[in-house]
């Protein structure tokens, strides 16, 4: 099953075990169609109990302006809900929010090659949240003389050009950002 990261649990809400979920796409309507999700981070206490496989059934979803409140079956108090904070929610790709022209799922950028002027710069290993937006974590070299390392490139139209998911390439527009 092809899973796609769709959001992250930011914290707890109330006394009944609800969690606040931030959508990676900024869209929340599709959360209403979820009956279960896979959570990426499980605290050992929960892993030892009934959630060994990582799948959680959803009891209720309430949409708000900047997040969604989600209630999972069996998570009935703030202490249990707190154990889920930081987890990413994964869903089957066919349940994800539809993309508009030119949009990509951030998760799909991982393992793409970052190229600048036809030269391989490195491989995108993850996507992190920064204060001004997403940052692509790259494993590669910032110059010919540099040792291989990890570095970050802002994921915005000023620095990122063509994205070809079939070819697994992302174009870096300006080499000077690596200096």
Swiss-Prot record:
Family according to the record: Belongs to the RimM family.
Domain notes: The PRC barrel domain binds ribosomal protein uS19.
Subunit composition and interactions: Binds ribosomal protein uS19.
Entry keywords, A to Z: Chaperone, Cytoplasm, Ribosome biogenesis, rRNA processing
Subcellular location: Cytoplasm
GO cellular component annotations of the record: cytoplasm; ribosome
Function, in words: An accessory protein needed during the final step in the assembly of 30S ribosomal subunit, possibly for assembly of the head region. Essential for efficient processing of 16S rRNA. May be needed both before and after RbfA during the maturation of 16S rRNA. It has affinity for free ribosomal 30S subunits but not for 70S ribosomes.
The protein, known as: Ribosome maturation factor RimM
Main location class: cytoplasm
NCBIfam families per UniProt: 16S_RimM
Native species: Treponema denticola (strain ATCC 35405 / DSM 14222 / CIP 103919 / JCM 8153 / KCTC 15104)
Domain PRC barrel, residue spans: 101-179
GO biological process per UniProt: ribosomal small subunit biogenesis; rRNA processing
PANTHER family: RIBOSOME MATURATION FACTOR RIMM
Key word rRNA processing present: yes
